[in-house]
Amino acid sequence: MQFIAASIAAGIAAFGASIGNGMVISKTLEGMARQPEMAGTLRGTMFIGVGLIEAVPILSVVVAFMLMSR
């Protein structure tokens, strides 16, 4: 039962991160289309945001492995 719970938790975290990444990237592209001169700044900020969003599923996978090793 622990394996199922851990895999569901990791899957939900990955799903949430993919939705979040899509929203961040789409808004960044909208901003680049409106202000092309800010493209470099927006791109750098986007990479930082995507990195922070991706930290959540990575941590959930680590927690899932910790739960499975009990």
Swiss-Prot record:
Domain of life: Bacteria
Site (Reversibly protonated during proton transport): 54
GO molecular function, one term: lipid binding
Pfam families per record: ATP-synt_C
Keywords in alphabetical order: ATP synthesis, Cell membrane, CF(0), Hydrogen ion transport, Ion transport, Lipid-binding, Membrane, Transmembrane, Transmembrane helix, Transport
Subunit structure: F-type ATPases have 2 components, F(1) - the catalytic core - and F(0) - the membrane proton channel. F(1) has five subunits: alpha(3), beta(3), gamma(1), delta(1), epsilon(1). F(0) has three main subunits: a(1), b(2) and c(10-14). The alpha and beta chains form an alternating ring which encloses part of the gamma chain. F(1) is attached to F(0) by a central stalk formed by the gamma and epsilon chains, while a peripheral stalk is formed by the delta and b chains.
Function: F(1)F(0) ATP synthase produces ATP from ADP in the presence of a proton or sodium gradient. F-type ATPases consist of two structural domains, F(1) containing the extramembraneous catalytic core and F(0) containing the membrane proton channel, linked together by a central stalk and a peripheral stalk. During catalysis, ATP synthesis in the catalytic domain of F(1) is coupled via a rotary mechanism of the central stalk subunits to proton translocation.
Stored PANTHER family: ATP SYNTHASE LIPID-BINDING PROTEIN, MITOCHONDRIAL, ATPASE PROTEIN 9
UniProt cross-references to HAMAP family, sorted A to Z: ATP_synth_c_bact
UniProt family annotation: Belongs to the ATPase C chain family.
Protein name stated in the entry: ATP synthase subunit c
Gene name, Swiss-Prot/TrEMBL: atpE
